[in-house]
Structures are given as C-alpha cells and as structure tokens.
Amino acid sequence: MVQISDLPRDLTEEVLSRIPVTSMRAVRFTCKKWNTLSKDRSFTKKHLRGARAAAKKKQTKEFQVIMMIQFRVYLYSVNLLNPSIERIGKLISLDVEDHVDISKIFHCGGLLLCITKDISRLVVWNPYSGQTRWIKPRNSYHRLDRYALGYEEKNKSCRCYKILRFMDDYEDDRALRLIREFEIYDLNSDSWKVVNVTPDWDVEFYHRGLSLKGNTYWFAQEKLPPLPRGRVITISDMADFLLCFDFTRERFGPRLPLPFHSFVEDTVTLSSVRDKKLAVLFQPCSASTVKIWISRKIEPNAVSWRKVFLAVDMKSLTGFQFDINAASFFVDEKKKVAMVLDKDRFSYKFTRNIAYIIGKKGYFEKVDLGESTVSSCASLVCSYVPSSVQI
C-alpha cells in the first residue's frame, strides 16, 4: 500500500495546499519531507493563494481575525450577522512547549510583534511559517515601553520590516527622573539605532498603535509640563489628535485631526478596515453613545474623515462604558456592524471575555468567549492575512 508520505511531490503539493493555515503545524511535525516542503517558497505561494481565495469567498459572511485571550494567540472565524465566533485553532506556538505568555500583540503585513508577559522579551513571529526572531534590547526593555511594527516598502516585492520602541515618562523615584528613549530595530541589519525625538505630545502606554500600509498611527494628546514636587492638579481637557510614525522616513508626522474631541476619561481606540482605511471608536464617559468613524483618506501627513459610520446608544444595551485601557474592535464596513472586545462588565469581578456586536437600529448581540481568569489581561483583536515573508 502506498503511504501518503510517498506520493510524488506535485501530488503532495496539491494535497497539502488544501490544508487550512491552522493545520500547518501538524503538517510540519508529520515527517521531515513535509516539513521541508511546507517551507518551500513555491509551495507557500500556492498555499497562501488558495487560503486567500477561500477567505475571499467567505468574506460575504465571515472574517478571520487574530485574538489574544488569556495570554495566548488564536485564529477565529467571525460572522457578525449570524452571529457566531468560532475558534479555528491556536496559531503555531512560539515554542514547542507553548510556555510563552504574551501580554501585547501588534500586527503588520502578516507578522506579529509580541511582548512577553514579564516585559523581558520581544519577538517577531510569522504565525503561518512558524518563524520567530527574538529581539535583544540595545540596553533593556521597560514596562512603559510603546511599540510599533511597520515596514519600508523599497519595491513591490521587497519590504524592510522595522520596530519602533519608545518611552517618554517620568519615573516616580523621588528624583522625578525623565526617561526618554526612541529607537528603531531593523530586521534586515539585525541592529538598533537611536532616533532623536523631542515630543510635544503624549501617547499613554495602554494605547496600542495601529499599523496601516506599513506605518503606525496612535491616539495622542498634548504633552503637559512636569509639576513641582508636592503639587497636584486635575486636568480633564487637553488637545487630542492622531499621530503617525512613517517607517520609510523614520520620523513622526504632523498632528492629524480627529472627527471628535475627547476628555481624559473617554474611551478612544483605533482599528483598520482591510489594511486600507483607519477606523476610530469614541465613547464619552459622560454619555452612553458609541460612535465609529472611518477615514476617507489616510497618509502619514494627512487624513480626512467620512460622516459617522455607526452611532449606537448603549444605555439600554449594556449601560456601561467600554474600558479606556482594554477595549479593541473591528468593523464590517459593508454590513455596518462592529465587534468590540471587552470583559463582562455586568459582573463585578470581570470573569468572562465578551464580544459585543453592535449595529444600526439597536442591533446588539453578546458572544461569550470564555472565562477570564486574569481580569487585567485585555482581549485584543486584529484582522489577519497569512504571509510567507521571511524573518
């Protein structure tokens, strides 16, 4: 009897190219021959072409997204109108024993930048190929670091991926010492370099940047001067804007206007629409209405906004404000529906991870994603398209 592992290469390729992305880990562990074939450039192109075609066929109803839940990273299939959220599988692990806890993820071009739970390690990961690159710090990493993953597109077939790491904070160590560090890691040269930046803006450490077309955008606010020791003031209102880091020019762009004005305790979070447009969610702490806008034009130096994409009064639906530190979301532009990930805020202990699906005319659904044993672990979501890029 002929074993499947003994099939001719062309027939083996045809069979394996039909296997879902989340099953590739099992393929690689089946035998050495399949492991070698799965990493072949011609095979990966064929496999990804088939995966994208299948995903496109399903996109009338479903999306594939990455979610980070309980310090683990999973691939989900999401139907916002049915509604249903199905865990397709855990993405290829960062290590065989799967003992790596992840606290933050950043997605760009099929790659994930992952920050470990203990803040001590940084890794770039291609979930499709299973490749990883552990990044050693120039000096050290810090709990208040902000990160971004982006790329410089040298031509249509060549992208130079880079990581931006920065912090600009005062440590409460009696000396009120300012730590200001801006540096870029180049994956091609495997090296860090310092970038000279004197910001007149602040990005809170819990605000994740959003990668779009190789650049990263943040919600930012006016920088406040340090206060004399012992003096405390309450500030609820300050200038707010969108800020972009251009990975080609390796510099921050000008302040870009938002379609609203927010206060300190309001919820503001960013998302992307098919890696072409930027979406922003805004919910004031003083009101119950959630509003979402989608950009008409978005570049490092310019942005224009469409009219409100979605406005939903949450008072009768949930009665609470989405978390300013943790809520993340994505939208189905055609169906005019959005999904917001947060905790079960009907419970005092926030013991469940919940997807809140909202739409026009009061459309509202809740999907329970399972137990949340660590209330401080935010559930993150981002759209995902597999990539064969080598790291």
From Swiss-Prot:
Pfam families: F-box, FBA_1. It is found in: Nucleus. SMART domains: FBOX (SM00256). Transmembrane segments: none annotated. Keywords: Kelch repeat, Nucleus, Repeat, Ubl conjugation pathway. Kelch repeats lie at residues 104-154, 163-215. SUPFAM superfamilies: F-box domain (SSF81383). CDD domains: F-box_AtFBW1-like. Component of SCF(ASK-cullin-F-box) E3 ubiquitin ligase complexes, which may mediate the ubiquitination and subsequent proteasomal degradation of target proteins. This is F-box/kelch-repeat protein At3g16740. It comes from Arabidopsis thaliana (Mouse-ear cress).
